UniProtKB/Swiss-Prot annotation:
Family per record: Belongs to the PsiE family.
Parts forming coiled coils: none
Protein's recorded name: Protein PsiE homolog
Provenance organism: Klebsiella pneumoniae subsp. pneumoniae (strain ATCC 700721 / MGH 78578)
Protein's membrane topology: Multi-pass membrane protein
Membrane is among the record's keywords: yes
An annotated GO BP: cellular response to phosphate starvation
GO-annotated cellular components: plasma membrane
Locations listed in the record: Cell inner membrane
UniProt superkingdom: Bacteria
Transmembrane segments: 15-35, 58-78, 82-102, 108-128
Keywords: Cell inner membrane, Cell membrane, Membrane, Transmembrane, Transmembrane helix
Amino acid sequence: MPSVYRPLVNFVAKAMQAVLNLALLCLGIILVVFLGKETLHLAHVLFTPEPVSKYKLVEGLVVYFLYFEFIALIVKYFESGFHFPLRYFVYIGITAIVRLIIVDHESPLAVLIYSAAILILVITLWLCNSNRLKRE
């Protein structure tokens, strides 16, 4: 690439990074609002005397952790020099599959497949945390 285009390329890269940062900041604020809403929902379900409310409480807790993990991912993005660590996506994947097992546990074969997916993600997490792939 000719050196004439270098300033233009740098400007475009910085402008796109600024747009991305602003969008992630907005997404983080929205997720914090939803986290607050989920907190109120969990408090309501906790004091509901229905027997079904225990399943809703556990499902709500897992959704709460999903919001929490996405917010932590956005925070880590800004702390780590504008990149997403892979292991946070793996944490989110494991939590999402656990939520799926809690909500939809009708088919034993499906639960077995979801459990195998969790095992694969845990192995991936182990590989990501090994010294060969660790960046942080």
